């Protein structure tokens, strides 16, 4: 299985990768995108099983990438790991088809709890 990690912070992508490994998902193919547009393009080209996205990124936000993917008929499991969390953001994410919304800081246990049902 393939997991796409989209975040404009290289350090945060590394932290998400490390936490995925700690949660037992290290055997998955982990690929990275540095902004929302790249996440959109890579999702269409690489066909990941899961997209873990930051909310605020240059070029295109994570929410804009999700909306654009859904409009194009792509139903990849997509959700957010972000430091910002408001009820409005969560409602927008759910309305766009987000599978999860994880608030930073996060733990390997939280990743396991959220991603095990998604990845099987």
What do these predicted regions represent?
Residues 57:
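Receiver (REC) domain active-site loop signature in two-component systems and cognate sites
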Residues 46-52:
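Active-site beta3 strand of CheY-like receiver
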Residues 8, 104:
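A Lys-centered signature of the CheY-like receiver
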Residues 35-38, 61-64:
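Acidic catalytic/metal-coordinating carboxylates
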Residues 54, 82:
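Active-site residues of response regulator receiver
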């Amino acid at each position: 299985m393939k997991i796409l990690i989209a975040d404009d912070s290289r350090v945060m992508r590394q932290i998400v990768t490390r936490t995925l490994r700690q949660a037992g998902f290290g055997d998955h193919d982990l690929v990275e995108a540095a902004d929302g547009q790249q996440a959109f393009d890579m999702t269409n080209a690489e066909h990941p099983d899961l997209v873990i996205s930051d909310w605020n990124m240059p070029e295109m936000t994570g929410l804009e990438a999700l909306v654009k993917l859904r409009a194009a008929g792509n139903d990849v499991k997509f959700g957010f790991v972000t430091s910002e969390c408001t009820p409005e953001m969560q409602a927008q994410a759910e309305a766009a088809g987000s599978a999860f919304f994880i608030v930073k800081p996060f733990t390997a246990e939280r990743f396991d709890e959220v991603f095990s049902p998604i990845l099987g």
